Amino acid sequence: MLFQIDHTTASVTDFTVREVPFNVVAPFIEKWHYSHSAKGQSPKHCFALMHEGDMIGGMIYGFFAMRNQWKKYSVYGVDDEFEVIELRRLVCIDETPRNTESYFIGQTIKWLKKNTNYRIIVSYADPHHGHAGTIYKATNFYHVGMTSPGKIIDYNGQRYHDKCIRDINKAHLRKTGERIPAQSAVRLINALESGEAKMVETPGKHIYVMPLNKKSKKLIVESLVN
């Protein structure tokens, strides 16, 4: 569907933000996000940006992909994995007014402050895809560093984290105690060996954090000063 918004009259204040189920926002993310994927997001809170009955933006907040990743942010007052949430997917259609994304993020931050006990939001901007985090700077996130360079697997137009080739068959492990590769891992390994897939080195990602309480904000600011 092609959305037409009159830039001369439309304002971000004409838009509404709703919390929606994952299955409502996922098709929108798959259509409009550069990754064309909503899989593996560990979704916890999903939001839709609406205009005159049409969804014009989608956002997914979820828990970290790696279980102990939250510990990196304990220096900002995070005591367990349920006190930090990651902004994992954000996209709006092209035909939206300036500042639409920052308005969208701002409204969801207000919602999270009011309805949850998270201490910080974390998001990553990937230079490999031409992103430096401009939208996060515009919404007053703090840039706190870079992740280490990594590798991804490019296969059939999809990109997979290189850890996917180390996934194990959990059902087999529970049944026999034997560790064997998951079928998805075997498929990627075979594709790499045949040349159908390739391993691509990627630069580190920009790390942005948004404090949701005064204590975390103080700790973030102090860490940047020091």
What are these regions (language model features)?
Residues 213-226:
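C-terminal/domain-terminus segments
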Residues 196-199:
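Core catalytic DNA strand-manipulation module of type IA topoisomerases
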Residues 44, 203-208:
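Short hydrophobic/aromatic beta-strand or adjacent loop that forms the aromatic wall/cage
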Residues 29, 43-63:
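Conserved beta-hairpin
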Residues 2-42:
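Short amphipathic alpha-helix that is part of the acyltransferase structural core
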Residues 16-19, 62-194:
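Acyl-donor binding region in acyl/amide transferases
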Residues 192, 202-203:
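Class I (Rossmann-like) S-adenosyl-L-methionine-dependent methyltransferase catalytic domain
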